[in-house]
């Protein structure tokens, strides 16, 4: 699975309250949530991300309260993948379950800059920056990769259910 795009870069400890503020949690429409993603840090984030971007972030991306809407909002805004030094565990699972690749690359904030163009092999963790530099992040394999390739957990379960019933 290959994912690519231009980089938007953020720092350490981006919590779920920053990713999608609590006042929007009563809404379920992914496109509405997307319009408010990262709003406290960058009110123009939705416009920047809509072309399809890769987020680069520091340590413990997605920390704080558990809210699935954080991953939903980012993906709906146009985020194709996130590369971070580390992720909060619950955010990491929510990202995978919603079809949003989350790649760990220690030191990434020193290696990749805002505006760089990156190409990620999700399975191997290979990250190519500006068609020149190559870095090795932690790839995603096994069941998490199958979930991502299906578009998320619900799509994966639908696919498996159809296969188990003798369909395509």
UniProtKB/Swiss-Prot annotation:
Superkingdom of source: Archaea
A Pfam family annotated for this UniProt entry: Aconitase_C
EC number: 4.2.1.33
Example GO BP: L-leucine biosynthetic process
GO molecular function: 3-isopropylmalate dehydratase activity
Keyword vocabulary terms for this entry: Amino-acid biosynthesis, Branched-chain amino acid biosynthesis, Leucine biosynthesis, Lyase
InterPro entries xrefs: Aconitase/3IPM_dehydase_swvl, AconitaseA/IPMdHydase_ssu_swvl, IPMI_Swivel, LeuD, LeuD_type2/HacB/DmdB
Catalytic reaction annotation: (2R,3S)-3-isopropylmalate = (2S)-2-isopropylmalate
Xref: Gene3D superfamilies: Aconitase, domain 4
Pathway: Amino-acid biosynthesis; L-leucine biosynthesis; L-leucine from 3-methyl-2-oxobutanoate: step 2/4
Similarity remark: Belongs to the LeuD family. LeuD type 2 subfamily.
Subunit structure: Heterodimer of LeuC and LeuD.
Function in brief: Catalyzes the isomerization between 2-isopropylmalate and 3-isopropylmalate, via the formation of 2-isopropylmaleate.
Protein name: 3-isopropylmalate dehydratase small subunit
Species of provenance: Sulfurisphaera tokodaii (strain DSM 16993 / JCM 10545 / NBRC 100140 / 7) (Sulfolobus tokodaii)
Taxonomy of the source species: Archaea, Thermoproteota, Thermoprotei, Sulfolobales, Sulfolobaceae
């Amino acid at each position: 699975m290959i994912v690519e795009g231009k980089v938007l870069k953020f720092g350490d400890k981006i919590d779920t309250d920053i990713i999608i503020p609590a006042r929007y949690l009563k809404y379920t429409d992914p496109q509405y949530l997307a319009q408010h993603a990262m709003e406290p840090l960058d009110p123009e984030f939705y416009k920047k991300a809509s072309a399809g971007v890769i987020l680069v972030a520091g340590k413990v991306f997605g920390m704080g309260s558990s809210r699935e809407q954080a991953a939903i909002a980012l993906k709906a805004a146009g985020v194709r993948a996130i590369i971070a030094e580390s992720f909060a565990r619950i955010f990491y699972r929510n990202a995978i379950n919603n079809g949003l690749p989350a790649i760990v690359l220690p030191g990434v904030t020193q290696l990749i800059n805002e505006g760089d163009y990156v190409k990620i092999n999700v399975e191997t963790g290979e990250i190519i920056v500006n068609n020149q530099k190559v870095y090795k992040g932690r790839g995603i394999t096994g069941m998490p990769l199958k979930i991502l390739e299906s578009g998320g957990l619900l799509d994966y379960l639908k696919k498996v259910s159809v296969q188990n019933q003798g369909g395509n």
